[in-house]
Regions:
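Charge-dense, helix-prone N-terminal extensions
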Residues: 1-76
Length: 76
């Protein structure tokens, strides 16, 4: 599955896109000034997204990659 397909599925399931997840991560204290804090681990993001949005591991890791800056909205 392409990264774009992950983002589309996540938006369909949760109603939230990349910008919304960035804002939510900031509110939760995972990011600061748009950057994932160094002490935040992937498992914390996965647990949050599973708990609050019922996302699976793969979809949660896509959001983690987005927050970490590994991928962006234009990644394939």
């Amino acid at each position: 599955m392409s990264f774009q397909a992950y983002l589309e599925n996540i938006k369909s399931k949760t109603g939230n896109g990349p910008a919304e997840f960035r804002n939510l991560a900031e509110e939760k204290g995972f990011t600061q000034n748009g950057q994932l804090k160094p002490e935040v681990k992937a498992g914390e993001i996965v647990a949050w997204l599973k708990e609050d949005f019922d996302l699976g591991h793969g979809h949660s890791m896509a959001i983690y990659a987005l927050l970490k800056g590994i991928k962006d909205e234009n990644s394939k």
